[in-house]
């Protein structure tokens, strides 16, 4: 492990006097239900030893706020409901966080380490003139953390002296918070939300009857070794037998075999299922960063020197075009 370093802050004007230790978690959701990574972030936030509040922003935030209030460990839920906050663009959410910080003087502001969290937390950190710490995998104390570096190939213990800690938590490193709470729900402080900084153009959502990659207990992923998109049927057939989610390596996505929402890796989705089956995937650093925390890893590859075998619990050196159909046929 690399040696610890100190994260310094230039924000000397932020007063620490008479502050109660308190943490704000910025919720991620789709206007109807809370994103699972927020539950992981709440668990991580509770390890700071502070009172935990959750900020829910959006055009229809009330329903999600009610869900959050029932989460164990949540003391307060702040709700900012405004049409300007539809789709929760980071440029529009940040002013609400800053207004909440001004009123409640939190000692830590956190979120899950997702595209949303990575968009909003550094923005708020810049406004507060402090350094943010990303991809935290372990909380040692209120000011000491372990985070990943170099696509997950190194870990580093860091200590922050900043008066406000700005953190994103890797979801797969923390258990999701359970229900059982009764947090108070109240309106968030009003904020000046500017709409000319960014614009939401639209999104295309893929529909699938298979489990979502982020929550699936079993994931079957295919790589460049499948040679074509049509051959991904081998992956789909096996996944359907196992009730699994389907993923892919970046190489398979870049080759056009499958859409990029299936990508597992540093620039894709981070997963940690009970079982991860990698088929025709060599095991590039970028891919390993997204799945190496899986409980059991099975690799099928004809190259005995493929890096994927270094992290696999079970490795099968075989031609995937023979091995996978045989495996699928053998399953009930």
From Swiss-Prot:
GO biological process, one term: fatty acid beta-oxidation using acyl-CoA dehydrogenase
Keyword match rRNA-binding: no
GO cellular component, one term: mitochondrion
Subcellular location: Mitochondrion matrix
Keywords: Electron transport, FAD, Flavoprotein, Mitochondrion, Transit peptide, Transport
Protein name per the record: Probable electron transfer flavoprotein subunit alpha, mitochondrial
Source species, domain of life: Eukaryota
MF terms (GO), sorted A to Z: electron transfer activity; flavin adenine dinucleotide binding
Cofactor(s) this protein cannot do without: FAD
Organism: Caenorhabditis elegans
Known partners and oligomeric status: Heterodimer of an alpha and a beta subunit.
Binding site for FAD: 275-303
Major localization listed first in the record, in broad terms: mitochondrion
Main function: The electron transfer flavoprotein serves as a specific electron acceptor for several dehydrogenases, including five acyl-CoA dehydrogenases, glutaryl-CoA and sarcosine dehydrogenase. It transfers the electrons to the main mitochondrial respiratory chain via ETF-ubiquinone oxidoreductase (ETF dehydrogenase).
PANTHER family from the UniProt entry: ELECTRON TRANSFER FLAVOPROTEIN ALPHA (PTHR43153), ELECTRON TRANSFER FLAVOPROTEIN SUBUNIT ALPHA, MITOCHONDRIAL (PTHR43153:SF1)
Pfam family, one: ETF
Family recorded in the similarity comment: Belongs to the ETF alpha-subunit/FixB family.
């Amino acid at each position: 492990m690399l040696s610890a370093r100190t994260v310094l802050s230039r924000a000397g004007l932020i007063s620490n006097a008479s502050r109660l230790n308190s943490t704000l978690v910025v919720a991620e959701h789709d206007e109807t239900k809370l994103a699972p990574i927020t539950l992981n972030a709440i668990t991580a936030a509770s390890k700071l030893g502070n009172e935990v509040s959750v900020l829910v922003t959006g055009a229809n935030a009330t329903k999600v706020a009610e869900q959050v209030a029932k989460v164990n460990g949540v003391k307060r839920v702040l709700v900012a409901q405004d049409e300007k906050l539809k789709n929760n663009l980071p440029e529009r959410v940040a002013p609400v966080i800053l207004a909440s910080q001004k009123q409640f003087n939190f000692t830590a502001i956190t979120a899950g380490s997702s595209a949303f969290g990575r968009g909003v937390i550094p923005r708020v950190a810049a406004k507060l003139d402090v350094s943010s710490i990303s991809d935290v995998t372990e909380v040692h104390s209120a000011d000491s953390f372990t985070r990943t570096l170099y696509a997950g190939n190194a870990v580093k213990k860091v200590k922050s002296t900043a008066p406000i800690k700005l953190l994103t938590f890797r979801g797969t490193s923390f258990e999701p918070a359970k229900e059982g709470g009764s947090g108070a729900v109240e309106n968030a402080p009003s904020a000046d939300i500017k709409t000319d900084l960014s614009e939401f153009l639209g999104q295309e959502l893929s529909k699938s009857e298979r489990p979502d990659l982020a929550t699936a207990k079993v994931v079957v992923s295919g790589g460049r070794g499948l040679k074509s998109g049509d051959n991904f049927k081998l992956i789909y057939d096996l996944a359907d037998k196992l009730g699994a989610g389907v993923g892919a390596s970046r190489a398979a996505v870049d080759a056009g075999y499958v859409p990029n929402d299936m990508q597992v890796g540093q620039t894709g989705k981070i997963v940690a299922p009970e079982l991860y089956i990698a088929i025709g995937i060599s095991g590039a650093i970028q891919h390993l960063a997204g799945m190496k925390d899986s409980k059991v890893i099975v690799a099928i590859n004809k190259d005995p020197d493929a890096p994927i075998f270094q992290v696999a619990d079970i490795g099968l050196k075989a031609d995937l075009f023979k091995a996978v159909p045989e495996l699928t046929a053998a399953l009930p």
